[in-house]
Amino acid sequence: RLARSVSAAESNRARASRVGVGIGAGVAVAGLVAGSVVARRRFLTNTANAARDLDPGFREPPVSPLVSTGPGSLVDPRGVGREGARYVGTATTGDDVRFVTGADPIADPIRVFVGLDAGASVQQRVDLAMAELRRTGAFDRSHLVIQAPAGTGYANATPVDVVELLSRGDCASVAVGYGLLPSFLSLNRVDLARHTQQALIEAIAAECDSRSERSAGSGRFGRPRLLLYGESLG
């Protein structure tokens, strides 16, 4: 009887030890998971904040009223982010057109950029982009490039440069951002990117249709030729 009691006590202690080890392991795993979640959130926040910081060379707003954040612009320079500031700050000028092509420019190109922080919703950002396009006279140009930027807001200026040069400046371009993280970290924003671009294209198409109706019978073409371009996740 004593032997059985001792054996039972030892069995209970072993069982309790295993339970304790299991609980300890569970707590440790939960701690690791929680720690990794916090670390990931901190990393994403820091990455997004870095994308908001402007490069030293683009901290001063452009001097042209034909680009976003320039004189008279409705876009706050603080709302375009690093990539947006680069995009509007490197617009081709009439002098560039003359230097590269040898031809006289028709006009200085228009560039519109609206970043993620410029509005609380897709509709607000698209509405702001449309207001900028109207303000700058973008719908009076022969070409309008609609660009879907990458996850960071990066809008590739190279294809836009080409259109600006070939049209001798008689063009406009627009991009609306939907995030601040690299595309491989923005896969959860695919629907937002698609919704943003769809809303922008539909708004521009409606404006062009309206202008075409108003100019019908006037003997002139009342809308620009639309060109679409997407970068990475865009």
What are these regions (language model features)?
Residues P65-G234:
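Soluble catalytic regions of membrane-associated enzymes that act on cell-envelope
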Residues R1-P77:
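Hydrophobic helices that insert into or interface with lipid environments
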